[in-house]
A protein has these predicted regions:
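Flexible, processing/modification-adjacent segments and terminal tails
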Residues: 34-43, 114-178, 241, 258-262
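N-terminal mature ectodomain segment of secretory-pathway/periplasmic proteins
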Residues: 35-120
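Gly/Pro-enriched, hydrophobic low-complexity segments
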Residues: 35-38, 62, 112-113, 122, ...
Length: 263
């Protein structure tokens, strides 16, 4: 991607879009959203290639997810996540929220799910890659892992699968950083991605909207503290049970419940 040329175009697109929305001229945007926008595809591909070529990284995230109660009231819950990854076989995820306080370890030979509140853990033997670990965790627990798309060896293939239309919405700012704003539509969900401009196209925000569920609940991830050259300890991806920890066949769903709300 020629970033300088592209950014020169971005300013004009943003201004035109802002003027169109100001005067209520939404028809052109609606028409544009019915097809794949090459600018959105270009940014998504650039980001995906960058992540795929990054051998190791660490990142923290603030996660907000919504649920719609039986009364129709929409509630939002917040949690925190931290991840360290070293391709192709090292993954550590920590998640703390109103329900879950869990850690996930993968060292290329075994997945370990550790529930801190229960001081209990479950093991899943698996010889494979991070891609295999993500798919196995979803299959074994029955829970989706929103945002895991960004961890795959080929993020573009996973993210673009099922996309029916896309739109490049210009640039914005997240935490003072200029970002490209992309919007995508699939059959059951809409999702948006904010990607840092320049030569480090890191994802800064990811929002998934489940559009056919009453209230259209959203799952939002703000990614921060990116480190693409982390110092990783030799045992970072290997679980060592703490004193008194219990080995279970599987963790209760409540220990991972925060992962369940956005589908």
């Amino acid at each position: 991607m020629n970033n300088n040329a592209f950014l020169n175009q971005v300013g004009g697109v943003s201004l035109a879009l802002g003027m169109a929305l100001t005067v209520g001229a939404i028809t052109p945007l609606s028409a544009q959203a019915q097809e794949l926008d090459p600018n959105a595809t270009e940014v998504l591909q650039f980001m995906s290639d960058y992540l795929a070529d990054t051998e190791a990284f660490s990142v923290n995230a603030d996660v907000d997810f919504e649920i719609v109660a039986n009364t129709g009231q929409k509630l939002q819950f917040s949690s925190y996540a931290s991840m360290v990854m070293q391709r192709p076989t090292g993954l550590f995820i920590q998640r703390r929220g109103p329900l879950a306080d869990a850690e996930i370890f993968f060292d290329g030979s075994q997945i370990t799910l550790f529930g801190r509140r229960l001081n209990a853990y479950a093991e899943i033997p698996l010889s494979g890659t991070i891609d295999d670990a993500i798919r196995t965790m979803e299959a074994e627990t029955g829970l989706p892992f929103p945002g895991a798309d960004l961890m795959f060896a080929d993020p573009f293939a996973v993210l673009s699968d099922g996309v029916e239309s896309s739109t490049y919405l210009g640039t914005a700012y997240i935490d003072g950083v200029e970002v490209h704003h992309l919007a995508f539509r699939e059959a059951d969900v809409d999702w948006q991605l904010w990607v840092q401009t320049g030569d480090r196209p890191l994802p800064m925000k990811y929002v998934i909207t489940t559009k056919w569920v009453t209230g259209a609940p959203e799952y939002s991830i703000r990614l921060r503290d990116w480190n693409t050259s982390p110092q990783i300890g030799a045992n970072r991806f290997t679980f060592t049970p703490p004193a008194g920890a219990t080995l279970l066949e599987a963790l209760p769903p409540s220990e991972l419940e925060d992962y369940q709300e956005a589908q």
